[in-house]
Amino acid sequence: MAAVVAATALKGRGARNARVLRGILSGATANKASQNRSRALQSHSSPECKEEPEPLSPELEYIPRKRGKNPMKAVGLAWYSLYTRTRLGYLFYRQQLRRARNRYPKGHSRTQPRLFNGVKVLPIPVLSDNYSYLIIDTQARLAVAVDPSDPQAVQASIEKEGVNLVAILCTHKHWDHSGGNRDLSRRHQDCRVYGSPQDSIPYLTHPLCHQDVVSVGRLQIRALATPGHTQGHLVYLLDGEPYEGPSCLFSGDLLFLSGCGRTFEGTAETMLSSLDTVLGLGDDTLLWPGHEYAEENLGFAGVVEPENLARERKMQWVQRQRMERKSTCPSTLGEERSYNPFLRTHCLVLQEALGPSPGPTGDDGCSRAQLLERLRQLKDLHKSK
């Protein structure tokens, strides 16, 4: 009987949440339209035009972010252009790096390495909530760094492990993922810097395309093109077959535990296609994200899908971890399919919660993309409690 009462209560709460979500979306849409009108009036009434940073190409979309801890917290197209295309962005990153080192001298989270048969994955907490990674061939003593934003922290881990850094894999150009490329590549003369040529990766030496493979010792790492967060965003898939273990996905800012990255340089359709790329991987694939966003993301997932018991169980585990400042990564893609709303745009429960969309639903790409965009709007407005 208690279970029946609880289920009934959850169902009622879900209906209330659906009404609230539709109201928020309506307000957000109206506010966005008002902002667009204001910008149009300002552009026509301005007596003179000052030199502006080089804008993003017309087909790209920038969605402002509400205030938060992420280095991308400042909003606006002009700021994004400055952050990614000028020295001001680098100086801002250096300021964030100094502050994080002072606040978290031992890192923002306590991490645990994963050991396989001759392979070690070591998460390195950097900045206020980022993760860099060392992927180590323990027999050859060779290491690959993923998104080494703090060269000091990454170098300390390299020395502690007693390995030789031979490659840097950069998921995208943002300084909180690429800021350590220069120092580490200079310190390790044989180190190659891999990334997308579309993304202006600092100190890039070896451009990668979709499905290219980087081989280091027994490490076989495949690059997958996943544009949306940036034009040239890549994720990296470590093949588990050579070491007879699970494959590992280093997802940068594409996919987080119960969340996904914001669409700074693309459309909802682009981001949906990129998410579908990783959805095609196996359920046992380990997800190593670029940020520690688990608790906030699961809180939002509970707003849009309050009856999801998998989300509730994961949230309880995450809260226990974070009370002790323990890292929440990795999760698995199988887990993410069960509670991550950005991977569940095909689910009827989300379609009902966010309201009807024009045209067919289900597997139709356009309608799923529209649902993804609505989820993103809500996530940007969401404040965890």
UniProtKB/Swiss-Prot annotation:
Record's bilayer topology term: Peripheral membrane protein
Q: Which GO terms describe its molecular function?
A: hydroxyacylglutathione hydrolase activity; metal ion binding
Disordered, as annotated region? 31-57
Name of this protein: Probable thioesterase PNKD
Ligand binding (Zn(2+) 1): H172, H174, H229, D253
Q: Which GO terms describe its cellular component?
A: mitochondrion; plasma membrane
> What is this protein's function per UniProt?
Probable thioesterase that may play a role in cellular detoxification processes; it likely acts on a yet-unknown alpha-hydroxythioester substrate. In vitro, it is able to catalyze the hydrolysis of S-D-lactoyl-glutathione to form glutathione and D-lactic acid at very low rate, though this reaction is not physiologically relevant in vivo.
